[in-house]
Swiss-Prot record:
Listed Gene3D superfamilies: 6.10.250.40
Signal peptide: none
Organism classification: Bacteria, Bacillati, Mycoplasmatota, Mycoplasmoidales, Mycoplasmoidaceae
Name recorded for this polypeptide: UPF0134 protein MPN_038
Species annotation: Mycoplasma pneumoniae (strain ATCC 29342 / M129 / Subtype 1) (Mycoplasmoides pneumoniae)
InterPro entries to which the protein is assigned, alphabetical: DUF16
Length: 116
């Protein structure tokens, strides 16, 4: 394994040693000229790279609604329109309630006139 690692890192003129210590453990080392060492790709991502990826993802975020793709901004605009429609519907409900009360008042007056 140690020789494989040395070949991978391209170390030339290398001397290795291994010696057993009195406590039963081993001491191992090497000495040589390092011509070229290649750094392997790591699976790690920096915070800056992650932030860039997340920003791109947020900008390209798509939501599928009833077989139509909508961007986040269009989705927010539709949310505002829905809120406005709900407010208008409440106002119409109040107006209808006032009309119903007025008709009930007229109906009571007509009943009084008929009873006389």
């Amino acid at each position: 394994m140690f020789k494989k690692r040395l070949n991978k890192d391209k170390i030339n003129d290398c001397y290795t040693w291994e010696e057993e210590l009195p406590d039963g453990s081993y001491d191992m080392g090497f000495h040589g000229n390092l011509n070229h060492m290649e750094k392997g790709k790591s699976g790690y991502v920096t915070h800056k790279q992650l932030d860039k990826k997340l920003e791109v993802f947020k900008q390209d975020l798509l939501v599928e609604l009833s077989e139509k793709f909508v961007t986040k901004e269009e989705f927010r605009a539709q949310g505002k329109q829905i809120k406005e429609l709900q407010i208008e519907q409440k106002a119409q409900g109040k107006t209808l309630q006032l009309i119903l009360e007025a008709l009930q008042g007229i109906n009571k007056r007509l009943d009084k006139l008929e009873s006389k």
